[in-house]
Amino acid sequence: TVIATQVGFSSVGINSTAPTATLDIGGHTKLRTYSENVEALSIVANAVTVDLSKAQSFTLTASDNVTQFVVQNPPTGSTSFTIKITQDSTGNRSVGIDTFKDNGGVTIPVYWPGGGVLPIVTPTANKTDIYSFRTFAGESITTAGLYGVVGGQNFA
């Protein structure tokens, strides 16, 4: 077993002499349990910024219409993230679940199952939808795109 640290980069490699992430494990990994950060998103000028350096699980209260999501800091390679969207007590907020851009304003294509059938975010007050997205190339997300799936809609 090789355990290495990279001086000046705060990286640890297990079975790797040149770690490429904060923790780089070169082999099968078994965890008894794990948890993820959950980050609350906010709407500013009808845009929502999803910073993937802060979390991969996000919550959003739709208190205004959302015309775009801006993805910041996608890691290199494959990653996924989930957004739980809850309509506020007013409801009827439109959410452009298919309108993703990078920090520079470049459109990120979103691919949906079923031949590209775009889901409609539940507009009913206090109802919740869950959407997950995956990219296989975070470093080129504007060309690789996101693959979106509906985790569920109209939760009470």
Language-model segments: which ranges?
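Extreme N-terminal basic, low-complexity initiation segments
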Residues: V2-V7
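Flexible, charged surface loops at secondary-structure boundaries
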Residues: V50-K54, P74-G77
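Predominantly extracellular/luminal regions of secreted and cell-surface proteins
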Residues: H28-L52
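Short carbohydrate-recognition loop motifs
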Residues: K54-L60
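Intrinsically disordered, low-complexity boundary segments flanking structured domains
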Residues: A18, L41-T49, V117-V121
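Short sequence segments immediately N-terminal to proteolytic processing junctions that release a mature
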Residues: G8-E36
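Acidic, glycine/polar-enriched metal-coordinating patches/loops
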Residues: L60-A156
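Short, surface-exposed charged micro-motifs
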Residues: T22, A47-T49, S132
